[in-house]
Amino acid sequence: MKNIVLGGGCFWCVEAVFERLKGVIDTEVGYSGGNPNPSYESVCNGDGNIEVVKINYDEKQIPLLEILTLFFKIHDPTSIDKQGADIGIQYRSIIFYENEEDKILAQNFIEKQQKIFSKKIVTQISRLQTYYKAENYHQHYFMNHPDQGYCQAVIAPKLQKIQSD
């Protein structure tokens, strides 16, 4: 089993996509990249942390390249600290890797994707230094609250788009 930690806007949205994939063992939303021991409130107030999803996956069933390809389909990797109406440094596009092999794969992936995108890709690639699990009420949010307003307005259409692709 391997882990990759991705930040690409609201962590509810990113988790909702990846927790449904064959080969993904588990997902968990959390925070990374900023001050120690963050809370949702501190992250929203700009403590430097990013909303992220830790994806535990079986690389024999779903390779990292497939995960990154889907990641680039579900968020705008050319947008600086913003995804849709969600604005702030906590929504930046970032790939946190745990080993050099994944770093190189991510770098090569972005290099190839840049040839497709007309705007500059701003997705950062960084070694995972710290990760803090988010509060329990954030875990598997869409799965637990599919009828909530944000879920219906933002997440459900994203899932429908992915399923139709």
Curated annotation (Swiss-Prot):
Q: Which Pfam families match?
A: PMSR
Q: Name the keywords, alphabetized.
A: Oxidoreductase
**GO BP, one example?**
protein modification process
Name the catalytic site residues. C10
Write down the chemical reaction(s) this protein catalyses: L-methionyl-[protein] + [thioredoxin]-disulfide + H2O = L-methionyl-(S)-S-oxide-[protein] + [thioredoxin]-dithiol; [thioredoxin]-disulfide + L-methionine + H2O = L-methionine (S)-S-oxide + [thioredoxin]-dithiol
Q: Does the keyword Oxidoreductase apply?
A: yes
- Provide the GO MF annotations for this entry: L-methionine:thioredoxin-disulfide S-oxidoreductase activity; peptide-methionine (S)-S-oxide reductase activity
Q: Is the keyword Oxidoreductase in the record?
A: yes
Function statement: Has an important function as a repair enzyme for proteins that have been inactivated by oxidation. Catalyzes the reversible oxidation-reduction of methionine sulfoxide in proteins to methionine.
SUPFAM superfamilies reported for this sequence:
Peptide methionine sulfoxide reductase
- Name the UniProt record assigns to this protein: Peptide methionine sulfoxide reductase MsrA
Q: Which NCBIfam families match?
A: msrA
By sequence similarity, the record places it as follows: Belongs to the MsrA Met sulfoxide reductase family.
Protein EC: 1.8.4.11
